[in-house]
Amino acid sequence: MQDGTLLAAVDLGSNSFRLEIGRYEHGHIQRVEYLKETVRQGGGLDEERNLSQAAMQRGWDCLARFAERLADFAPRQVRAVATQTLREAKNRDVFLERGNAILGHAIEVVSGPEEARLIYQGVSHLLPQSDERRLVVDIGGRSTELILGRQYQAHEVASFRVGSVTWSKQFFADGQLTAAAFRQAETAAQAMLDEALAVYRPERWERAYGSSGTVGAVAEILAACGHESGVIYRQGLDWLLQQLLRAGHTSRVELSGLKDDRRPVIGGGLSVLRALFDLLQIDRLHVAQGALRQGALYDLIDRSSPGTDKRSATVAGLAQRFAVDGAQAERVARAAGTLFAQATPQAGDDAARELGWAAQLHEIGQRSAHSGYHRHGAYLLQNSDIAG
């Protein structure tokens, strides 16, 4: 990738949509522009898990504004990712069809583990080089991601369906902030996160980091109110809980550092964060600067070179996992590559690389059935938790 190349990441979160534009310089990304809009799409899911028309319209309106900034960007310069709300939404295809057209770039609904991997990429690239074993926590609107990693490599990734929007809607729907509601919310969060303890127990990491969303919001409040900046301690969470209980209602919370868009979801977010502190025995949580969107930007850099493209390793792993006939795949790749070069000589290396992956995986569905194997293969690929 050439120095000076502009890259963009669009993060369609459950609470906010974000656009980050950066310039590639000597292996690093310098921020050029950052936009954030509170869309609260996660709050627009009904009991049948369908997005309301109003929630979709808020999202489309935001994407239209982002599209103005991305008009001159080529597809290889942009990665747009959607997370838990669109993973859940039964009518997501309705939103995506129009959203893709408005944005001018394909929106990818990433799996929970892929979201966690990208979060770790974003966090690790903005931390000093270190060999420490890291725990990374990201509490979003409808999901919480946990990652164990070292340097730039994530070793364990997991995503749980508990977040600030869902917990606020479930336990603080009327805005009332009571001790009983917090007890119920924390107990429910621990029940959802309990299985994480086997993998993310304290002896497996040396330092804990929190990124984006709730962690950033809580850290800003604590710092603005005189607590140590850049780190969250349990006593800080206890102090914040008392302030919320004293206020009694979200509309009456008066705290420096609390932004208006965080006010309706601060109860749910704090209860999940407190549950994690208890469950994983966290005594201090360092606030990371990177998050999902930075991870998507650095992933674009990796994708620009065949040697670092995570998707190549993923394809090789899938071919081995499903016992694809390697010799046959290679013959298909050569034949398809020859025809492709003759038919579209102007096509670039990216398209040829994707065709090669398709050749490696085109018979993957035969592990399920010979009849209609291409449809089985498509289903397996679409529903596998795979990196990249």
Predicted regions and their residues:
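A generic beta-sheet turn/junction motif
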Residues: 12-14, 139-141, 150
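Helical "lid/coupling" subdomains associated with nucleotide-phosphate turnover
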Residues: 2-7, 24, 40, 44-73, ...
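A generic, well-ordered mixed alpha/beta core segment in the N-terminal half of proteins
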Residues: 133-147
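Conserved beta-strand/loop subsegment of P-loop NTPase cores
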Residues: 77-80
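N-terminal glycine-rich anion-binding loops that anchor highly charged ligand groups
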Residues: 28-39, 73
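Structural motif
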Residues: 16-18, 143, 215
